[in-house]
Design a protein with these regions (language model features):
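Extended, low-hydrophobicity, polar/charged segments
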Residues: 1-170
Length: 170
């Protein structure tokens, strides 16, 4: 019999994230997780390791909106427009969360935060730019492991609201 711990050990995924995948019936996603000893802490590192476009990496950023944590899923090639996040949430103030708040909220360290399977239930926003690809890669709970997933499935399993919060260029 396999357990989240043995699955996590085989895949390189964090045990909490492996358990979340099993609870969602996503064992096949766990089987596709890939561990890279050189690390996938940043979107650029993950894209280089996987061999995909930077925009195919789903990065997760944690913000504090009027003191309440909110998670934003963004494609790896884009930047979050904090003013758009503020407007989307109707918040007076939105700031980047520090490492302590990230770990307290999600249960994971910066550079390995997955899109779901967090310690606490938190509001999640997903930028529409993620839908431009058939598959995106996201962290599997460690700064060395990523997994592929269809963007709409990622948004659904994260319980995210689909929004437009990326910075506009030019």
């Amino acid at each position: 019999m396999t357990t989240a711990a043995t699955d996590a050990e085989e895949s390189g995924a964090h045990p909490r994230f492996a358990e979340a995948l099993r609870a969602l019936g996503l064992d096949e996603v766990l089987a596709r997780a890939r561990r890279f000893p050189e690390g996938t802490r940043t979107a650029a590192e993950a894209a280089a390791a996987v061999g995909c476009a930077l925009s195919q990496i789903c990065k997760l950023l944690v913000f504090a909106a009027d003191g309440t944590p909110v998670l934003v899923l963004m494609d790896g090639a884009s930047r979050v427009d904090v003013d758009r996040v503020r407007a989307e949430l109707g918040a007076a103030k939105v700031t980047r969360a520090d490492a302590g708040l990230v770990r307290e909220t999600t249960g994971y360290a910066i550079g390995g935060v997955p899109p779901f399977g967090h310690r606490t239930r938190t509001r999640v926003l997903a930028d529409r730019s993620l839908l431009a690809h058939e598959v995106v890669w996201a962290a599997a709970g460690t700064p060395h492991t990523v997994f592929p997933i269809e963007p709409r499935a990622l948004v659904a399993h994260a319980g995210a609201d689909l929004v437009d919060v990326r910075e506009r260029t030019g």
